[in-house]
């Protein structure tokens, strides 16, 4: 691995999880690639609209890429439906950053179908909630298709609750298997978002920019920066972590399903301001 050996890395994160304070921060070495990725949107944020409308709204709001989910573009979509979607994306100047969250199981044939779909739509990353017995299959598939799998956390009670839960399961697997860090859910799990990025450095392929009012299980989603997410610090850490230029950096806003546009526009402005500030630093 490019950061630390997996074993020493997990030992370090175990100490952090236990509450040990360190004199130096983990994973802050500079990267040779400091280019910030494009800002996209997880289309679940626009689930109240039909796909064609949602993509137009994504463009009008200023996003450059989109992350699909099955409710907006199903894995069993026809070739005609996929072609029409790709044509609209091209006309709007949008690219696909990923698709998910998808489940993987020990059914290797079903797992392959998800990868074949991702290849068809041109998704470089699949965000996922993989069963433990799926990893042998995933190791083979990420090599064959050269498509990343990014494990998504879903907060308290989920098997991938904290960053260390993800690190433990990917330890001995292909480096294309990594993390999609939903920063909102990490807030719900009581974890500091910038610290999560440092811990996942080198295996971080997706980000869901999301904020919550309180660091507890039951809380309310809020506009970026109005809860516990320091967006500028998050973008800084992404740059330091060498987040891939084609990584899935997706704003996700789950509130106000029927009329989310004004709120998403406000979130977008916060994120772009932070990105512009960080990109101007030398």
Regions found by a protein language model. Give the residues of each.
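Active-site beta-loop-alpha junctions enriched in small/polar residues
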Residues: 44-46, 69-73, 101-104, 131, ...
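Active-site acidic/histidine proton-transfer and metal-coordination neighborhood
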Residues: 14-19, 52-53, 88-178, 187-189, ...
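Histidine-acidic metal/acid-base catalytic patches
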Residues: 2-40, 47-61, 163, 167-180, ...
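Hydrophobic faces of well-ordered beta-strands that scaffold small-molecule active sites
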Residues: 37-42, 66-68, 96-101, 126-128, ...
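Flexible, glycine- and charge-enriched loops at secondary-structure boundaries
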Residues: 75, 82, 128, 159, ...
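Short amphipathic alpha-helical segments at helix-loop
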Residues: 70, 77, 123, 150-151, ...
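Glycine-rich, proline-tolerant flexible connector loops at the mouths of alpha/beta enzymes
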Residues: 67-84
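Catalytic domains of carbohydrate-active enzymes, especially glycoside hydrolases
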Residues: 54-69, 122
